[in-house]
Design a protein with these regions (language model features):
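Lumenal/extracellular ectodomains and adaptor appendage modules
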Residues: 1-208
């Protein structure tokens, strides 16, 4: 059974702890997958996510079909952790079984999870996706930890083969690599001094 294509998200953190103080920030990650096939006959889809830091093990999956969206029952989600003994990295493989027979073209599967980062200054984001997906966007929502209403700063990242990442007024070249038909996007993101909540949203769309 072929998969619907996957996105591999790896979060590599550089930890800086000053004055023996530990501070944490929660990063919520959303991955959206669309079909890489014209016709879907599969009844399941799987993806891999590396959890390099301990955090919430809960993964909430949504199936979006047209204007409808609903949470996929956890009994339809199979999880397996694979440990790389050399690096100590655990890769979680999730398999999602359709509740409605088969997945259809342009179905979106949104997966939400979160991890705790301790005194994090820099995070490298690495994503792998089949080259058929030519549109790639990253949105960052800054939510100050203060009780006041959070600011909604949204930054979008669009890439076709090569592109640029824009954060505020700064623009950084987006690095891409191709390996066995899989395009990999890379960018290092520097967290602000204050610890805020960031929401990362990836969208993978098949070309028209």
């Amino acid at each position: 059974s072929q998969n619907m294509g996957y996105a591999l998200l790896s979060l590599n953190k550089k930890v800086v702890i000053k004055d023996n103080q530990t501070r944490a920030v929660t990063v919520s990650m959303i991955q959206i997958l669309t079909s890489e096939h014209d016709l879907i006959v599969d009844d399941s889809v799987s993806f891999e996510a590396e959890h390099l830091v301990s955090g919430s093990d809960e993964v909430v999956c949504h199936l979006i079909r047209g204007s409808e969206s609903h949470v996929i029952d956890s009994q339809h989600i199979l999880s397996e952790d694979k440990l790389d003994r050399q690096t100590g990295t655990t890769t979680r493989v999730l398999s999602i079984v359709s509740e409605h027979g088969t997945f259809k073209r342009n179905d979106l599967i949104k997966l939400v999870t979160s991890v705790e980062l301790t005194a994090c200054e820099a995070t490298n984001i690495s994503i792998k996706t089949p080259t058929r997906y030519t549109h790639f966007s990253l949105e960052i929502h800054d939510q100050p930890t203060a009780v006041k209403a959070p600011s909604r700063l949204t930054h979008k990242w669009d890439a076709i083969r090569n592109g640029f990442y824009q954060f505020g007024q700064e623009q950084t070249k987006l690095t891409t690599r191709e390996d066995n038909g899989v395009m990999q996007f890379e960018h290092s993101l520097l967290f602000p001094k204050q610890f805020t909540k960031h929401l990362y949203s990836w969208e993978f769309n098949t070309p028209d």
